[in-house]
C-alpha cells in the first residue's frame, strides 16, 4: 500500500469520529414520557410479552433486523492472523456494507479466542441478541468445524461468508461463462489452486449443480491432492483427492482444463499454463490483491479466455458484496432458521440471471464507458447494481419457505418485492398510487430528448413497469446505437415509437400548424419551419396538440424557461385558471414536503398565488396525501406590515373563499409551518394541524432557494418534480440534473393526468 493511500485510509477511519458505525435510536427521546416508555417502567410491557411468546421479540425489538459479524481475526483478508482487535476495522466495514446494500443493522463482535470449542460457546450464547450470524475471517480448517457446530446448535442462520459468499458468486460466474462459450457444466474439467474454505465451498456448490467430481483436480501448497498423499488428510481435502496418476504439479494437470479456479496466491498461473488450457477457457483468478495471473497476461496468450478476478479494476469482479447482504435480507425477512443449500443455489441463479438483464442506469453511471451487456467481459453483475436486492432476496426467501426453514413465511411476494424496491428507489412508496393508476391505462407520452441516455434508460423502465407507451423524438440511428451500447432490451416499433427529428414526413403539417397557432405571437413561417426542424420540444408539443400523443416530458437538456416558452403559449392555461406554477416534492426523513412556485412566476400576485396554492393541493391529493398548506413569509401572523406579507394575507383570503375545506394558514415563518408547537405558541387556534406539507413561498427566489437548500442539506432526501401545474395539457418540464427515476416518476404522473383529461 502506497503512503498516500495509507494516510487517506487512516484519516477516513479517524475523522470526523473514530470508526465507521454508530447506534442511532429509532424512537423519540425528547420528553420524560418518552424515557418512561423506552426504559423503566414502560419497557416491562414488551419484556413480559416476549417472555410469553419469544416470537414477539421480532415485534418489539430490533432483533429481526440485527446480524452479528463475528471473527477471531485468524485469517483477516490478506493480512493473516493479526488477532481479533486488529481485525475490528474489517468487521466494522462488513457491517456498513450490510447496512448500505440491504438495510441490515450489524454489531461487530471480535472474540479473542483461538480454541474452536470455546469460540463456539461464546457465539452460541449470543443467539438471543441476533437473527443471524456472519462468520468472518476465521482460518481453515477450524472455520469448517466452527460453522458446522454453530449451525447444529443455533436456531438462526449461520453463514461463513469467506466460504459461501465467494462460492455463490464464483458459481454464478462459471454458469454464465460456460453459457457464453457453449459448454455444459457436467462435461467440463476444472483445476483448482487452493484448498481453503472458499475453494472447498466453490467445489461443493458446483458439484451440487451438476459438475462431475471426477472432473475436478485440486492443488494446494504441496501440489496435486491425490489419495493417500499424506496420513490424516483433512476431510474437506480428502473429499476431492484424485487417483494417483503420477501428476504432481499445477503445470502437470492444467493441460486441457476448461476452468481454472484460483483461491490461492499471486502468480501461481503462468502464461505457459494458460496456453495449454482447452478452447475458450474460463479463468477465475481470485487471489487478492494480486491474482494468480493478471488478465492482460492471460489475454496475451489466449484472447478467447474469459477472466474473473477479485479486483474492481478488471471486468468480472467476484465480490462477496454481490451476495451476503441480500442472502441475509431474504433469510431475515422470513425468519429463517438456517441458510441452507437451497437458499444458496437460489442466490446463484438470481445473480446469474441478473447479468442477462438490461443495463442499469446506476451501474452505467458508476462504470462509465464499460460495455455492460452480457458477454465475455460481463458475466456477473456489478456490486452497485440496485436490482440485486429485489432479485436475490426474494429468491432466497422463497427457497427458505419451500425448503421448510422459514418461521414467518411471506404471503404476498408482489408486496414484498415492492417493499424491497423502496430500499432502492426512495420514491417508490410515494409514487405507488401514481404507478398503480398509470398501469390501468398507459398513455402515449412523447419524450422530447429521446437520444439522451437517461431517457433511454427511463424508457426501458417504463416499458418494464407497464407505465406508458413511450414516443422518443430523435434520430433512429443514434437511438438504436445507444440502446445497443447501453445493453437495453427495448426495440423500436415494438416497445416504443420513434419520431425522426430530421425527416419525419409529418413535419410540413407540423410547422404549418405551429405557424397558425403562433403567428400572432411574433412567429413567422420561416421561424415556425426552423423551430420544428431544430427544436424537439416543439415537435413533442405539436404531437400532443394534434392528438398524436397524450402527454409530453422535456427539459433533460436546456433551461427550464426555454421549454416553458414553447409549451405555455402553444397549449395555454387549463379551464378555470389564469396562471401556471411549478411545484417540487422533497421526500425527507421527517416527511414529504412540497414547495411552490419553484420555476414559473418570479413575483406572483395574490390572485396567482391563490391559484397556485389550489393547484398544488389538487396535485398533492393525486399522491394520496391530504394537503396541509402554509403560506410563508418573513412576517409571522401579522408581526410585520409590508407588501410581501400583505400579499400572503390576501392569498389566504382568496384561497379560503374558494376552498373553505382546505387546511391552510398564514402568513407564517418556516419553523412555525413545520413545528406545530412553535405555531401554537403564536397562534393557538390555527386551523393548520401538524406539520405543513405544502409550503407556498411569496416569490420564486424564496421557493428556489428553500428547495435547493433542503435538497442538498438532507443526505437522505430525494426529490420528485418539477410538477408543472395549470397548463392545458399534461406536460412536465424537468431539469438537466433529473435522474432516470425522476423521469420515470414524471412520465407516470403525466399518464395519470392524461387519463383524467377531458376528451
Give the location of each predicted region.
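N-terminal ligand-binding/catalytic initiation module
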Residues: 1-158, 398-399, 406, 432-456, ...
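Glycine-rich adenosine-cofactor-binding loop
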Residues: 66-78, 83, 167-171, 181-207
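A short, aliphatic-rich alpha-helical micro-motif
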Residues: 127, 185, 253-254, 274-277, ...
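Rossmann-like adenosine-cofactor binding region
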Residues: 237-306, 311-313
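NAD(P)-binding Rossmann-fold cofactor-contacting core
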Residues: 193, 209-237
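Anion-binding alpha/beta catalytic cores of soluble intermediary-metabolism enzymes, centered on
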Residues: 85, 137-184, 407-410, 417-689, ...
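Adenosine-phosphate binding glycine-rich loop
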Residues: 157, 161-162, 181-184, 287-393, ...
Amino acid at each position: 500500500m502506497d503512503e498516500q493511500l495509507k494516510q487517506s485510509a487512516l484519516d477516513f477511519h479517524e475523522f470526523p469520529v473514530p470508526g465507521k458505525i454508530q447506534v442511532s435510536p429509532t424512537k423519540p427521546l425528547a420528553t420524560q414520557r418518552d424515557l418512561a416508555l423506552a426504559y423503566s417502567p414502560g419497557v416491562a410491557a414488551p419484556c413480559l410479552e416476549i417472555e410469553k411468546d419469544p416470537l414477539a421479540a421480532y415485534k418489539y425489538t430490533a432483533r429481526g433486523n440485527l446480524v452479528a459479524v463475528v471473527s477471531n481475526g485468524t485469517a483477516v483478508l490478506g493480512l493473516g492472523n493479526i488477532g481479533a482487535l486488529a481485525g475490528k476495522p474489517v468487521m466494522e466495514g462488513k457491517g456498513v456494507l450490510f447496512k448500505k446494500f440491504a438495510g441490515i443493522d450489524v454489531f461487530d463482535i471480535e472474540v479473542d479466542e483461538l480454541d474452536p470449542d470455546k469460540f463456539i460457546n461464546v457465539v452460541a450464547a449470543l443467539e438471543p441478541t441476533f437473527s443471524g450470524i456472519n462468520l468472518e475471517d476465521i482460518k481453515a480448517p477450524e472455520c469448517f468445524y466452527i460453522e458446522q457446530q454453530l449451525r447444529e446448535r443455533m436456531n438462526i442462520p449461520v453463514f461463513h461468508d469467506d466460504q459461501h459468499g465467494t462460492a455463490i458468486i464464483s458459481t454464478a460466474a462459471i454458469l454464465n461463462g460456460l453459457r457464453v462459450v457453449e459448454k455444459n457444466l457436467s462435461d467440463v474439467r476444472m483445476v483448482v489452486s487452493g484448498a481453503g474454505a472458499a475453494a472447498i465451498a466453490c467445489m461443493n456448490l458446483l458439484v451440487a449443480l451438476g459438475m462431475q467430481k471426477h472432473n475436478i483436480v485440486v492443488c494446494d501448497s504441496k501440489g496435486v491432492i491425490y489419495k493417500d498423499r499424506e496420513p490424516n488428510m483433512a476431510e474437506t481435502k480428502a473429499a476431492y483427492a484424485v487417483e494417483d496418476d503420477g501428476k504432481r504439479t499445477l503445470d502437470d494437470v492444467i493441460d486441457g482444463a476448461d476452468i481454472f479456479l484460483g483461491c490461492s496466491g499471486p502468480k501461481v498461473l503462468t502464461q505457459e499454463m494458460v496456453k495449454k488450457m482447452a478452447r475458450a477457457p474460463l479463468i477465475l483468478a481470485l487471489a487478492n490483491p494480486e491474482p494468480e495471473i493478471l488478465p492482460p497476461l492471460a489475454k496475451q496468450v489466449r484472447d478467447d479466455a474469459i477472466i474473473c478476478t477479485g479486483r474492481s479494476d478488471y471486468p468480472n469482479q467476484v465480490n462477496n458484496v454481490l451476495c451476503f447482504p441480500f442472502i441475509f435480507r431474504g433469510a431475515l425477512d422470513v425468519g429463517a432458521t438456517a441458510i441452507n443449500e437451497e437458499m444458496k443455489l437460489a442466490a446463484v441463479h438470481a445473480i446469474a440471471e441478473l447479468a442477462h438483464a438490461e443495463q442499469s442506469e446506476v451501474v452505467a453511471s458508476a462504470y462509465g464507458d464499460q460495455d455492460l451487456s452480457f458477454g465475455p467481459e460481463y458475466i456477473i453483475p456489478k456490486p452497485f447494481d440496485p436490482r440485486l436486492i429485489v432479485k436475490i432476496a426474494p429468491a432466497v426467501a422463497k427457497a427458505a419457505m419451500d425448503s421448510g426453514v422459514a418461521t414467518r413465511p411471506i404471503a404476498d411476494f408482489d408486496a414484498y418485492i415492492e417493499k424491497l424496491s423502496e430500499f432502492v428507489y426512495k420514491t417508490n412508496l410515494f409514487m405507488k398510487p401514481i404507478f398503480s393508476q398509470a398501469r390501468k391505462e398507459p398513455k402515449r407520452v412523447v419524450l422530447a430528448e429521446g437520444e439522451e441516455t437517461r431517457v433511454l434508460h427511463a424508457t426501458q423502465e417504463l416499458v418494464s413497469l407497464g407505465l406508458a407507451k413511450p414516443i422518443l423524438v430523435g434520430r433512429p440511428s443514434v437511438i438504436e446505437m445507444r440502446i445497443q451500447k447501453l445493453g437495453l432490451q427495448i426495440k423500436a416499433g415494438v416497445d416504443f415509437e420513434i419520431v425522426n427529428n430530421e425527416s419525419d414526413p409529418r413535419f410540413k403539417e407540423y410547422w404549418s400548424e405551429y405557424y397558425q397557432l403562433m403567428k400572432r405571437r411574433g412567429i413567422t413561417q420561416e421561424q415556425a419551419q426552423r423551430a420544428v426542424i431544430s427544436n424537439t420540444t416543439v415537435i413533442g408539443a405539436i404531437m400532443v396538440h394534434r392528438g398524436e400523443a397524450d402527454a409530453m416530458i422535456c427539459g433533460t437538456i436546456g433551461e427550464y424557461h426555454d421549454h416553458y416558452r414553447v409549451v405555455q403559449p402553444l397549449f395555454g392555461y387549463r379551464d378555470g385558471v389564469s396562471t401556471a406554477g411549478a411545484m417540487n416534492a422533497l421526500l425527507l426523513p421527517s416527511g414529504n414536503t412540497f414547495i411552490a412556485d419553484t420555476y414559473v412566476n418570479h413575483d406572483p400576485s395574490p390572485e396567482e398565488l391563490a391559484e397556485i396554492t389550489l393547484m398544488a393541493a389538487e396535485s398533492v391529493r393525486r399522491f394520496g396525501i391530504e394537503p396541509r398548506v402554509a403560506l410563508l413569509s418573513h412576517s409571522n401572523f401579522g408581526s410585520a406590515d409590508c407588501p410581501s406579507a400583505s400579499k400572503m394575507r390576501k392569498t389566504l383570503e382568496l384561497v379560503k373563499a374558494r376552498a373553505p375545506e382546505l387546511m391552510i394558514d398564514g402568513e407564517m415563518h418556516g419553523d412555525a409551518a413545520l413545528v406545530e408547537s412553535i405555531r401554537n405558541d403564536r397562534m393557538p387556534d390555527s386551523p393548520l394541524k401538524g406539520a405543513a406539507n405544502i409550503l407556498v413561498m411569496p416569490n420564486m427566489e424564496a421557493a428556489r432557494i428553500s428547495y435547493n437548500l433542503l435538497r442538498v442539506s438532507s443526505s437522505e432526501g430525494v426529490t420528485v418534480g418539477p410538477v408543472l401545474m395549470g397548463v392545458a395539457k399534461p406536460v412536465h418540464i424537468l431539469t438537466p440534473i433529473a435522474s432516470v427515476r425522476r423521469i420515470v416518476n414524471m412520465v407516470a404522473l403525466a399518464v395519470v393526468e392524461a387519463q383524467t383529461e377531458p376528451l
